[in-house]
Amino acid sequence: EGTLTFYSDGKYASSLETHLSTDVPANWVKYQVPCVRLRDYLTEPVDFLKMNIEGAEWQVLADSEEQLRRIREMVIEYHHLPGLPRTLHQILTLLHRQGFEYLINDFDSETNGGVSSPFRLTSQSRFYLLIYARRLD
């Protein structure tokens, strides 16, 4: 709860992540936005949750871990971007711990020009994954 800094290019790209705070592209605008915790909204069963939060997936999932058992299925867009911590393993471990089975699909460079081939992984590589998770109990 409180406010976070949100960066946007005014079109499609945006981020809440602090890796931009020292290297913000000139055409991006910085906003202070109010924020709330997802966990505060997970008080009743949820059929489906879609999460596309531009690199903040791990922080939100970790903060909401105990409430995730109320979700039947979800899709998480995972962002692997230069300057962000690599949190895929933590996310998948958390999902497993909370009783989810999951499938992972990647965005390819043919459908998303901002994506690097996973076969050319470097410290500057960027790729996006869709994690489909479902409780089987």
Predicted features along the sequence, with ranges:
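Phosphate/nucleotide-binding beta-alpha loop and adjacent structural elements of enzyme active sites
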Residues: 1-137
